Amino acid sequence: AYRIASLVAGGTIPCVFSRGNHDLRGACAENLSDYMPNESGRSYYDFRVGCIWGILIDCGEDKRDDCDEYGHTVCCEPFRRRQTEYIRQKIADSAHSYAAPGVDYRLVISHVPFTHNITESDAFGHHPFNIEIERYTEWARLLGEYVHPQLMFCGHMHELTISLPGSSYDDKGQPCPVLVGSKPEKRPDGTQYFIGMAVTLNPGAAEVCFTDSEGKTLHRETLKI
């Protein structure tokens, strides 16, 4: 992670890393915290960069802990439970976090867009990704009622979406617009390229731009925040 940050930003731009669900898989997954920024070994934390305050939320895996795919190697439910308490702690200490002097923008970063209505089913007609509905709804409520974030940044879905509160994606009460900006694509010759997202924050507005790895802008939209 540190090498990626160095190659991308050259030490001139602050970088924030959000662990994804695939990072929990593999022989070295339990050692990942040795190779990426964290807070006391935790992959969820809050940060302050100038006038920006943000909180990273880590949903862990995207299916139940007892899913056969994991072979009994993950234990994400208690991990998410601790994050509920962490969010409550930040609310109780708001004067030193999102309500601190000089904070103009409040962001939520989560690889998994936990407020999304994910209806994808498996071969048996089950919905393995539709998990933790009560907990994720509680996270959304706490963030919306107390933190009042302006934007949530996500990936995971391999798509490009701007979901406003109350949209067809929102079934848990989004606290703010949710931006999903991470999509791998293939060229006609089979080689891959990537589409990402850039967001420019201005007083009262955010410019969202989806741009591919070849420098082409696919979509640009300004949101009121």
Where are these regions (language model features)?
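Extended active-site neighborhood of metal-dependent phosphoesterases/phosphodiesterases
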Residues: 1-97, 129-130, 138-139, 149, ...
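Short active-site segment of divalent metal-dependent hydrolases/proteases
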Residues: 23, 114, 159
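A short C-terminal boundary segment appended to hydrolase-like catalytic domains
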Residues: 189-190, 197-225
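Active-site glycine-centered loops adjacent to acidic/histidine catalytic or metal-binding residues
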Residues: 20-21, 111, 155-156
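Active-site-proximal segments of metal-dependent phosphoesterases and phosphodiesterases across multiple
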Residues: 76-80, 95-150
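Metal-dependent active-site segment of extracytoplasmic phospho-/sulfohydrolases and closely related
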Residues: 149-157
